[in-house]
Amino acid sequence: MRSISLMFLKRKKFWKRTFWFGLITPIIVFSILVLVVYVKQDSIVKNLIKNANKDFTGSIRIKDSHVAPFANFPYISIDIEELEIFEGKNRKKSERIVHIKDAYIGFDILELLSGKYDVKSVRLSNGDLRIIQHKNGDFNIIKAFESKKPAKEIEEELHLDLQSIKLDNIDVSKFNESNGIMVDVLIENAKTRLQSTKQNFTMNVDSKFQLNLIKDGDTTFLKHKHFEVATELDFEKSKQILKVEPTEITLEKATFNFDGSVDFLNDVFIDLHFKH
C-alpha cells in the first residue's frame, strides 16, 4: 500500500513539474525575444530610417521608439512614435504627407529566433495622410517614394515582408490643386492581409470608414457617409489581370455586392457585375 502511495506521489510530482515546465518555458522564451528586440530596437529603427532616407526622394522623421510586445500580437512590435514623411528633404510642414502618432512594425517570433528581422506587419494608429495632386499632374506621395533602385532591392534593404496592415483612426485626404476637389476618408478601422507568390498577389480587406467630398472648401452631398467594405483582390502578374472576388459594400443602411475583373493589358478593361 505504501509503495502504491509513493508511486502516486512520484507521478503527481512528475505531472506537476511537466505542467510548470510547459507553462514557464514559453513565457521565458517570449521574454528573451522581447529583451532581444528591446536591445536591438534602436539599431533596427535607425537602419530602416537611414535606408529609407537614402533610397527615396522624400524623407522620414520620428520622435522616439519603444518595444510594444502586445500591440500587434502575435507579432512582437516596435512602436515608432510621431512618424512623419515629407515630400522632399527639407522637411517643411507644408510638404508633410504623413503624420502618424503610433506606427507599430511587427516581427515574427520564430524568425527572430533564427536572427531574421523582416517586417511582417504594420499597424498605424491615429494620424493623417495628405495626398496632393499638383497642377502638373504629379502626386506628392509618388514623388516622395521615387527611387533609382529596383523595388526588390529596396524591399531587401528595408527588410520588408509584409503580411498584414492595420489602420485605426487614420484620416486620408486627396486634394486636386487644379479643380479644388478634395476627397476625405476617415478610416475608423481597416485590416488588410497580404500574400505574394511568383504568380499572384492577393489582398483581403475589411474596413469601416466615413467619406466626404469637398469642393472649394464646402462639403457636397457626400458628407459623413458611412461605408463598410469586405473584399478580396487577386492580381495575376503574368496576365496583368486584377480579379475582384465577391465583394460586399454597405453604404449607411444599404448593402450591395459585386465581383469582376480589371484587364490592364486590354486598355484597362473593367468588367464588374453588381448584385442586389
Residue ranges and their predicted role:
Residues 93-98, 200, 206-240:
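Beta-propeller and related beta-repeat scaffolds in trafficking/envelope systems
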Residues 2-14, 58, 74-77, 81-200, ...:
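Secondary-structure transition motifs
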Residues 2-57:
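N-terminal type II signal-anchor transmembrane helix
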Residues 170-172, 240-249:
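Transmembrane beta-strand segments that form the barrel wall of outer-membrane beta-barrel proteins
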